[in-house]
């Protein structure tokens, strides 16, 4: 399999049902080696569900998904995942290094001891995430930003071709946010494909190569510079043309009938406003 295949993502006509309700429909999305793609949308829009579907944790009702050249869950050696921070048990008495090593479990195998390559991968991941000096510290002693970097290091320990990040900027201070932004851009420049969900619209517009507006389906998918039509943002977030959000993302101005970027051809999605 080529490097370009390992860094690729292809989602075609995806639909997902959860609890008997359709939460995603007609999702079409692609990413290539070295892309940095941001998924933006309101709470409940399906952003995390898209990531979980790519991981094989959610089964599609319809459509196809290929990540790192394989079906979801099949290419796990090449996929790293950073969940939302609250999903980790931070009160568990374990060191930073041990958490990062846990990211190598599938590579090591169950009930087997880590080898030299595993220790090298963990050391490199800790250094990349700026956590090498805290390797022996218990995770319960860490700040919010440090905890986020531990989860990123754990994902990097797999040496992924594709890195999926769920709300990586939530609850971190400005220096950590700047450090993470620099890290993500560097990883992308080195050929890692990154897909992140975030509510930090300013950060996403300043950092991502492409922005995908999501509300149960793909509303628009383009570069930040091209997503200046307020109509796309109004439809995604259910806001009026006078909303301050439009100024925040640089989309304030007359509402035009044409849509910037690549608009979804599916029927207009209902606006999700809660998780």
Task: Give residue spans per PLM region.
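Conserved ABC ATPase signature
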Residues: 138-142, 146
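ABC ATPase nucleotide-binding domains
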Residues: 225, 229-275
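Conserved switch/coupling elements of ABC/ABC-like ATPase nucleotide-binding domains
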Residues: 216-221, 225-226
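Helix-to-loop junction immediately C-terminal to a conserved catalytic motif
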Residues: 55
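Conserved ABC ATPase "signature" region
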Residues: 116-134
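Catalytic Walker B motif of ABC-type/P-loop ATPase nucleotide-binding domains
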Residues: 163-167
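Conserved ABC transporter NBD signature motif
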Residues: 63-75
């Amino acid at each position: 399999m080529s490097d370009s295949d390992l860094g690729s993502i292809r989602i075609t006509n995806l639909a997902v049902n959860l609890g008997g309700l359709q939460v995603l429909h007609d999702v079409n999305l692609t990413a290539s080696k070295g892309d940095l793609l941001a998924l933006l949308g309101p709470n409940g829009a399906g952003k995390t569900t898209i990531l979980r579907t790519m991981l094989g944790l959610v089964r599609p009702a319809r459509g196809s998904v290929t990540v790192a050249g394989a079906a979801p869950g099949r290419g796990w050696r090449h996929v790293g995942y950073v969940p939302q921070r609250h999903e980790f048990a931070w009160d568990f008495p374990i060191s930073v290094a041990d958490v990062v090593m846990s990211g190598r479990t599938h590579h090591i195998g169950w009930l087997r001891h880590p080898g030299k390559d595993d220790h090298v991968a963990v050391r490199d991941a800790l250094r990349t995430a700026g956590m090498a000096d805290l390797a022996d510290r218990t995770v319960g002693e860490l700040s919010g930003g440090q905890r986020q970097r531990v989860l990123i290091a754990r994902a990097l320990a797999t040496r992924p071709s594709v890195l999926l990040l769920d709300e990586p900027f939530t609850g971190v201070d400005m220096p950590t946010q700047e450090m993470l932004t620099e890290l993500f851009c560097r990883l992308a420049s080195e050929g890692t494909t990154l897909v992140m969900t975030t509510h930090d619209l300013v950060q996403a517009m300043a950092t991502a190569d492409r922005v995908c507006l999501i509300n149960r389906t793909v509303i628009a998918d383009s570069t930040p510079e091209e997503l200046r039509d307020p109509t796309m943002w109004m439809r995604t977030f259910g806001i009026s043309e006078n909303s301050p959000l439009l100024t925040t993302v640089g989309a304030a101005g007359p509402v035009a009938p044409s849509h910037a970027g690549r608009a979804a051809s599916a029927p207009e999605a209902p606006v999700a406003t809660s998780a």
